[in-house]
Amino acid sequence: VIWRFVQGRRSSRKAVLLLGLCDAGKTLLFARLLSGKYRDTQTSITDSSATYRLSRDKSTNVTLIDLPGHESLRLQFLERFKAAARAIVFVVDSVAFQREVKDVAEFLYQVLVDGTVLRNAPALLIACNKQDVTMAKSAKLIQQQLEKELNTLRVTRSAAPTTLDSSGGPAQLGKKGKDFDFSQLPMKVEFVECSARGSKGEEGDADLEGLEKWLVKVA
């Protein structure tokens, strides 16, 4: 009975949230998933949503929601949509990652210790975008660096926790007494390399096969 109740609550959540910093490529990725076509994008200041069909018979779909990445807006929009999230795609700029790693980890930390996210445990994909660029970091390196930064953040924040879990106590990231890794989280976390632009530029196809397979799986 409990399992059916949990499954029922999960099936009522149909949104896949696209999160990430500004210029990570969320909006182009959103457009590519929906139309397959390249389009010029600008920094978003509001959300965009659309139905994404997962099968040819159109019987399975989710609602893709692209949320702004600007620092002053992103938590506000996460607050608005987090309860509806069946899954989260956290988009990372693989080219700028080394420079932005602290900011990326900071935002991801805020997502991961959110009480609603911890309670609902939506599937999480870290989409390592812009892999068409030679200087892009690999998904493996990005995972290692994020785990290291999140572990550091956990230590520095533990002295003054500001986030409460569903029981009213301070939210704990990972397992106490152990270095953080993503396997310690209540949700399943996967990494994928992708390119919303594609290796052939504006005229070619995007490289989103791994992301598209993941969307089918979590739907």
Regions found by a protein language model. Name each.
Residues 13-16, 49-51, 59-64, 85-89, ...:
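Beta-strand-rich binding-surface signature
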Residues 95, 109-219:
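Conserved GTP-binding G-domain of TRAFAC-class P-loop NTPases and closely related GTPase folds
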Residues 30-34, 45, 67, 76-80, ...:
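Short coil/turn segments at secondary-structure boundaries
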Residues 74-101, 105-118, 124-128:
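Inter-motif core of Ras-like GTPase G domains
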Residues 2-4, 36-38, 48-50, 74-78, ...:
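Eukaryotic intrinsically disordered and solvent-exposed regulatory patches
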Residues 56-77:
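Switch II (G3) loop of P-loop NTPases
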Residues 30-34, 68, 82, 86, ...:
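Amphipathic alpha-helical interaction motifs in eukaryotic regulatory proteins
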Residues 1-62:
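Conserved G1/Walker A P-loop phosphate-binding module
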